[in-house]
Amino acid sequence: YGMTEADFLSAELCCVPAFNACDIGFDRSFVGAYGHDDRVCSYPAYTALFEEASEEHTTMVVLADKEEIGSEGSTGMQCAIFTDLIDALAASFGAIGAEVRAHSKCLSADVNAGFDPNFKDVCEPLNSTFLSCGAGYAFTYPSPTGSRGKGGSNDASAEFVGEIRKLFNENGVVWQTGELGKVDVGGGGTVAKFIAKMNIDTVDIGVPVISMHSP
């Protein structure tokens, strides 16, 4: 390939499993795949964007990187490119970026930790999301994300959560709510808190998965 040892000093290399996605379970009810947590969120996000026929509102999808290390760097959700982009779009219409963000709504797509009977000690059974909870897709919007007493979480407003709940019910979306692991035992974070910091109403949404970071 014409590479030398020096090229590895600036190379960005990724080692990933080579096997294809497959059905898992006695009834083939589960999907097993590398990177399933990212793909199950990003694919419906951009297909919904492409299929949106209404021109009443401006819609966008942001696919960010580095979430597992705190959304740092120029490709993470803490980068200013998102606010810069909104400011540029607002300026083209003679609007103010801060006002546009205040009137914006965001669904932060990320998977939730589904209840796993093999590791049930880190979950709260009465406040967890479950796989195969009914027909269609099982969406969650866990407000109590975060860890260590739910520090670092995003607390969506009751009004916005109610708006999303009404939207789901009117469109036949199967949904459930649940926390991201038992308080002070399980836990995790999403990029929702960074978007909410921009004064954008934000709520987490995503399918529950198990074995989230396994190969």
Language-model segments: residues:
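Flexible, glycine/charged-enriched surface loops at secondary-structure junctions
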Residues: 2-12, 55-61, 94-103, 168-182
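Active-site-adjacent substrate-binding region
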Residues: 6, 116-119, 123-214
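Solvent-exposed alpha-helices and their adjacent loops that cap or buttress functional pockets
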Residues: 6-8, 22-24, 38, 50-55, ...
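A short glycine/serine-rich beta->alpha loop
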Residues: 26-36, 67-72
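Class II aminoacyl-tRNA synthetase catalytic cores and aaRS-like
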Residues: 28-30, 50, 56, 60, ...
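Active-site nucleophile and cofactor-binding loops and adjacent substrate-binding regions
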Residues: 33-38, 179-181
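Acidic/histidine-rich catalytic neighborhood of metal-dependent amide-processing enzymes
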Residues: 43-131, 136, 186-187
